[in-house]
Structure formats: structure tokens, C-alpha cells
Regions:
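C-terminal catalytic/substrate-binding lobe primarily of soluble NAD(P)-dependent oxidoreductases
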Residues: 1-179
Length: 179
């Protein structure tokens, strides 16, 4: 992957998979996410000892708790971790299709630097990449650029003004040939 290098990726669930598959006829949409070895090790241990379960368990005193809720309660506030985050994110889409009668694959992506994001907004790069796009969308609606007068998913709207505004807001979109 550009900037961050080769990473192991895991197939995950994500909201966008559903709307994209529904709204893009014939699309094969999957969401993959990279995690570091430490995260995977911790996740595996928690899973193996049942702490990721959403099913209540009875304690020795007779009370019941949901293991996953206990884990969530014990985790630090994610914003408290932001000052120590280092490195960069790379979030993108591999898009396969046909253009001008030729098969083509492109990788469309953006990169956020954790330290730069923290210096700008007091949060880490993942939150930055999650927060800037909805703000850009709101600006386009407020300006009347996106004025469809109905509920719509982003993929239903003209992409160019959105991608240009993301760049203006500090989250430029890059496209490389991945054929």
C-alpha cells in the first residue's frame, strides 16, 4: 500500500459494504482492514477466554455481566491515546472495471499522518479520516452543490466536487493504476 507498505489485511464487516453493493449493480464489495500483530494477539486472547462474548455470564456472587461490556469499560478513552500515535494511515479502494473498452484496476486512496492530525484537530489519523468527509459533505449540501432534495448515499452524488473539497480540507485523494 502506498506510504504504509505491505500489510496483512483482514476481511471485516463495515456499513459501506451494504450501501455500495445495493447501489452499484453487480458490484462485489468487500471491506478489508489492516491490524498490527500486537492488536491481533490481544484480540485472539480476549476471544479465546470469552471476553468478546455478548452473552451474559454469571459471576460467583450471582450477578450477571456481559464480557464485552466489561472489556469496553476497562479500555482507555481512545482520545487519550491520540498524542502517542505515530505513523500514517492509508485508506482506499481497489476498483476493478472497464474504461474505454479495457479492463482496468485503480487504487483510490488518502493518507493521514497521526501527528499532523493531532496537531490540527487533537485526534489521531483514523478519526481525522472519519471526520473530514462528513464535514465536506455537509459543506457541499450547505453550498447547494449537492442538492438532491432526498436522502442519498455519498456514492449517489457527483464525486468530483467531494474529492476536490477533501483535498482543500487537508485530505487529498490520490489515484494510481493498479492493473
Amino acid at each position: 500500500l502506498p506510504v504504509v507498505g505491505t500489510r496483512r489485511a483482514y476481511l471485516c464487516g463495515h456499513d459501506e459494504v451494504h450501501s455500495l453493493a445495493k447501489n452499484m449493480d453487480g458490484a462485489d464489495v468487500r471491506f478489508w482492514m489492516g491490524f498490527g500483530d500486537h492488536y491481533i494477539n490481544v484480540f485472539t486472547v480476549l476471544k479465546n477466554i470469552g471476553l468478546l462474548s455478548e452473552q451474559p455470564v454469571k459471576l460467583a456472587d450471582g450477578s450477571e455481566v456481559v464480557p464485552l461490556k466489561v472489556v469496553k469499560a476497562c479500555l482507555p478513552d481512545p482520545s487519550s491515546l491520540a498524542p502517542e500515535y505515530e505513523g500514517k494511515t492509508c485508506i482506499g479502494d481497489f476498483v476493478k472495471g472497464t474504461k474505454d473498452g479495457k479492463e482496468r484496476t485503480v487504487f483510490i486512496y488518502n493518507v493521514a499522518d497521526h501527528k499532523e492530525a493531532f496537531n490540527e484537530v487533537g485526534s489521531q489519523g483514523i478519526s481525522y479520516t472519519a471526520g473530514v468527509p462528513p464535514v465536506a459533505a455537509a459543506v457541499l449540501v450547505a453550498r447547494g452543490t449537492w442538492d438532491v432534495k432526498r436522502m442519498a448515499n455519498v456514492e449517489d452524488l457527483p464525486a468530483r466536487p467531494f474529492l476536490e473539497l477533501l483535498g482543500d480540507m487537508g485530505l487529498p485523494t490520490r489515484v494510481i493504476d493498479a492493473t
